[in-house]
Amino acid sequence: MGQKINPLGFRLGTTQSHDSIWFAQPTKYSENIQEDKKIRDWIKNYIQKNIRISSGVEGIGEIKIQKRIDLIQVIIYMGFPKLLIEGKPHKIEEFQTNMHKKLNCVNKKLNIAIVKITNAYKHPNILAEFIAGQLKNRVSFRKAMKKAIELTEQAGTKGVQVQIAGRIDGKEIARVEWIREGRVPLQTIRAKIEYCCYTVRTIYGILGIKVWIFSK
């Protein structure tokens, strides 16, 4: 049996960089990791609860965290940043103060920056969210996968692979279905491959979605 390694961890230091950049003493390391998870979860929950999303796509590509002694810098890469900025001019400031209260950072300043992803559907997280939205609306999984591949081709990628696992279309026996278009060289370390795994809760149960995108 072939052993599958995570494509992002496999390429760290060559085409991939770390999502969290900070240094801590060994005794404080676990606290920092928990804080990072809390930040990421809070941002996702805030967007789900406070923003009306018609397409079902939140548009969060990735959240990068950089820490110094007196500062926490959070960079949110979004495909559709208007969702967070539109409506109220002080929305980001309100968002920042709410997060500061939640994290209880007494001696640290919190700074949030939002960066727009130029081609949203070139990012696997946004594509997986799109597929999840389609599956929730009971669109056929094949139709959802084909539409997702069309969107990535329009964004100008070299290859894409999509995999859905679970009780697809409500069938009693769980199975795995996948589709690939173009090249996805998982063995080539120099190849810039973006990857994500995403879970979606449907009326039939939980489905797992995996997306690999070969950009360059």
Curated annotation (Swiss-Prot):
NCBIfam families membership: rpsC_bact
Domain KH type-2: 43-118
GO cellular component: chloroplast; cytosolic small ribosomal subunit
Keywords: Chloroplast, Plastid, Ribonucleoprotein, Ribosomal protein, RNA-binding, rRNA-binding
Domain of life according to the entry: Eukaryota
Membrane-crossing segments per the record: none
Gene this protein is translated from: rps3
PANTHER family from the UniProt entry: 30S/40S RIBOSOMAL PROTEIN S3 (PTHR11760), SMALL RIBOSOMAL SUBUNIT PROTEIN US3C (PTHR11760:SF19)
Complex formation: Part of the 30S ribosomal subunit.
SUPFAM superfamilies, alphabetized: Prokaryotic type KH domain (KH-domain type II) (SSF54814), Ribosomal protein S3 C-terminal domain (SSF54821)
Location of the protein in the cell: Plastid, Chloroplast
GO molecular function: rRNA binding; structural constituent of ribosome
Family: Belongs to the universal ribosomal protein uS3 family.
GO biological process, alphabetically ordered: translation
Keyword rRNA-binding: yes
Protein's recorded name: Small ribosomal subunit protein uS3c
